[in-house]
């Protein structure tokens, strides 16, 4: 019983002994803001620019995006290898033509192939 009375007394003292906000704090803050305003005005600082609030933070936290299916692997086409053969022959014929034209102009075929490889690396 004595312990309960003692604890209630200590709790009461702790509540009433807590520091309170000083009186007139808002008035002091307003006076300091006016003083700052007058100092900025004397120094030539653009006060109107200071009064405008900074740009609002556009990051509003995590916003889920629409689900994209780009992560899914591409399905292999069921194209028959026979249909690719004419395309490969046409490409080989064009390459042979370019190499022959290069030889007629005095360019080494290895240089032409190296140039084509270099161009294809950056694409």
Swiss-Prot record:
GO molecular function, one term: neuropeptide receptor binding
GO cellular component labels: cytoplasmic vesicle; extracellular space
Signal sequence annotation: 1-17
Keyword Disulfide bond found: no
Main localization (coarse): secreted
Chain positions listed as propeptide in the UniProt record: 30-31, 66-67, 75-76
Alphabetized UniProt keyword annotations: Cleavage on pair of basic residues, Cytoplasmic vesicle, Neuropeptide, Secreted, Signal
Protein name: Neuropeptide-like peptides nlp-40
Consequences of knocking out this gene: Defecation defects including a distended intestinal lumen, a strong defect in intestinal content expulsion and reduced anterior body wall contraction.
Keyword check for Secreted: yes
Protein's cellular compartments: Secreted; Cytoplasmic vesicle
Tissue specificity of this protein: Expressed in intestinal cells.
GO biological process annotation, one example: positive regulation of defecation
């Amino acid at each position: 019983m004595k312990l309960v009375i003692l604890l209630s007394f200590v709790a009461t003292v702790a509540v009433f002994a807590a520091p309170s906000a000083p009186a007139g704090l808002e008035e002091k803050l307003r006076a300091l803001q006016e003083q700052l305003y007058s100092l900025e005005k004397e120094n030539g600082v653009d006060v109107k620019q200071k009064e405008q609030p900074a740009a609002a933070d556009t990051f509003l936290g995590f916003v889920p995006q629409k689900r994209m299916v780009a992560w899914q692997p591409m399905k292999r086409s069921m194209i028959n290898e026979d249909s690719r053969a004419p395309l490969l022959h046409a490409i080989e014929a064009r390459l042979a033509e370019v190499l022959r034209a290069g030889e007629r102009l005095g360019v080494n075929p290895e240089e032409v192939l190296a140039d084509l490889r270099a161009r294809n690396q950056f694409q």
